[in-house]
A protein has these predicted regions:
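Amphipathic alpha-helical segments
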Residues: 32-54
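Metal-dependent catalytic neighborhoods of phosphoester/phosphodiester hydrolases
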Residues: 176-191, 207-221, 324-328, 348-352
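Long, structured stretches of catalytic cores involved in phosphate-ester chemistry, encompassing
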Residues: 303-375
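Active-site metal-binding motif and surrounding structural segment of the metallo-beta-lactamase
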Residues: 130-133, 145-200, 302-319, 331-335
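Core dinuclear metal-dependent hydrolase active-site scaffold
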Residues: 91-164, 236-308, 374-423
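Compositionally biased P/S/T/G-rich terminal and signal peptide-adjacent segments
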Residues: 1-31
Length: 423
């Protein structure tokens, strides 16, 4: 098999490891490097005919993307003294500047209430761009049975009844509660929605740590890659750390991918999450997905107060995810929890990170209690909460997950649901 680095000049320095990034994409890691060696690697690429496509620096983290027969992405992180060189043969170029588009809609963020009748997770965020198209994040679990239809109807409603246009669909990672309903939409509702591009970076289904992940993750990754590959009209952008891309009037910066976890173990599949910082209408929204301990270390070490934002999606549904320090640095006025009230209440005393995020915020919102609509730029007091649409089927939940609750608790939860439903 041809070595992808045969046609890419590489600095004369021993590597600390070579990583299979998936789909023919590979990465070389060099430790004990300097910024001068980063510049040398860039010069080698340029002298070999690679064209500088994009450059973006964050504090003392330097990133350049070059294009030739393959895409070469090179970045150096001073805090780690580490240089990474990624060779990507399959990605599509992204927009490096804001798109020239109509100004016909209010830029708005929604935390969507996924159907939690049978499941306590899932995550779907939608951002309406100023031209009325959407950038959306993740989707819902297979047990949110009707959410493929609910998501399309929601986007249609906020498109003025027109066929929704998704300018970009981003996936943090390939757990079923984040991708399953997207797959159903593409396979069964393709004529009802236009999807221009998908943005993601997943590890291979046969990753070196895949034996920790279980058969379900293997099957979901295989299905996702097949469905996306067969959707030939959808552009596929493979994201790498430090890249800054634009979708309509929205700016995104890639903060972390599974490539940054290497050479450490990715036993916890949540560490495969790609984290994004979005800037919209001058305000920042941080989406860490389900980022966990290893990803958290990467972002704290590299970015510090660059993580400051106006709105933060709390990692991993408020279960064990990013650290309390992550939320101190984010210091967001609005915290979003893609979880049910039940699980939120269970985790609150256990998770210092949740308590820190809430203590710092002026407001926080739990997805199961109703879709939250946040006009951008974010201003405290302008968030609208929609009536609650779904409620737990406790018999079904017990049969699936063996979660059992007292009659008193179930009655209390139902009474609270009725208040939210009728508000």
């Amino acid at each position: 098999m041809k070595n992808i680095f045969d046609d890419i000049p590489v600095i004369k320095k021993g590597t600390s490891g070579r990583y299979d990034c998936s789909k023919g994409c590979e990465m070389l890691l060099f430790d004990d490097c300097t910024n001068a060696e980063y510049n040398l690697q860039c010069s080698l690429l340029e002298n070999a005919g690679f064209i500088l496509f994009d450059e973006h620096n964050i504090k003392e983290n330097y990133h350049r993307t070059y294009r030739s027969a393959v895409t070469a992405h090179v970045y150096y992180c001073e805090s780690e003294k580490a240089l990474r060189l990624v060779a990507d043969p399959n990605t599509t170029p992204y927009s490096t500047k804001p798109e020239n588009c109509a100004d016909t809609a209010k830029t708005t963020l929604w935390q969507f209430e996924v159907d939690h009748t049978l499941i306590d997770c899932g995550m779907f965020y939608a951002v309406r761009c100023k031209d009325g198209s959407f950038f959306v994040i993740d989707s819902a679990h297979m047990y949110s049975v009707n959410d493929d239809t609910r998501i399309i109807e929601f986007l249609k409603k906020h498109s003025g009844g027109k066929k929704p246009v998704v300018a970009g669909w981003f996936f943090s990672h390939c757990h079923e509660d984040h991708v399953a309903k997207f797959l159903d939409i593409v396979e069964y509702h393709r004529s009802e929605i236009d999807i221009e591009a998908v943005y993601y970076n997943f590890p291979a289904a046969d990753h070196r740590d895949a034996h920790y992940w279980g058969e379900c993750n293997y099957a979901m990754t295989e299905r996702f890659e097949r469905v996306v590959r067969e959707a030939t009209d959808i552009k596929k952008i493979n994201l790498h750390t430090g890249q800054r891309f634009y979708v309509r009037n929205l700016e995104f910066v890639v903060l972390c991918t599974h490539e940054d976890v290497f050479p450490h173990s990715m036993e916890d599949f949540n560490n495969s999450s790609t984290a994004l910082m979005m800037t919209a209408e001058g305000c920042k929204v941080l989406f860490p997905g389900d980022a966990s301990a290893e990803s958290d270390k990467v972002m704290l070490r590299r970015y510090g107060d660059y993580l400051k934002c106006d709105v933060v999606q709390v990692s991993h549904h408020g279960h064990s995810g990013t650290s309390p320090e992550f939320y101190r640095l984010a210091n967001a006025e609005c915290a979003l929890f893609a979880v049910t009230q039940i699980k939120f209440d269970e985790e609150y005393p256990r998770q210092e990170a949740n308590r820190v995020a809430i203590d710092l915020a002026k407001e926080y919102h739990i997805a199961s209690n109703g879709t939250a609509e946040i006009p951008l730029p974010y201003v405290f007091g302008q968030t609208k909460i929609y009536p609650d649409e779904t409620f737990e089927d406790f018999n079904g939940i017990f049969n699936l997950w063996c979660y059992e609750y007292s009659d008193e608790m179930k009655q209390k939860l139902y009474e609270e649901f009725l208040k939210r439903k009728n508000r």
